[in-house]
Amino acid sequence: SKSDFRAVKVKECVAVPKSKKLLQFTLDDGTGTDRTILSGIHAYYEPEELVGKTLIAITNFPPRKMMGIDSCGMLLSAVNNLKDSEDEELHLLMVDNHIPAGAKLY
């Protein structure tokens, strides 16, 4: 089955206790039921700067437990390898806030 890409709005984002990397997102995916996705991107973003953003998620992955929390999907990001360095930078894919939650990407 094909991946289902949807616009999602970040309602809440918090650092997962006892985890250096994980952020827990509470997302509006247009269904009327909040969706939880965990993402190991705390090195790149502080949770509060992501609230209110419109992101892209793959929403038809089976739930996966991380630190005891069900993560229901995956957020899309772009990774750039920094020149002359082992480091990479990660950017969550953010889209125009006019795009409604749940809009399907083709």
What does each of the following model-derived ranges do?
Residues 1-106:
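Phosphate-backbone binding interfaces of nucleic-acid-interacting proteins
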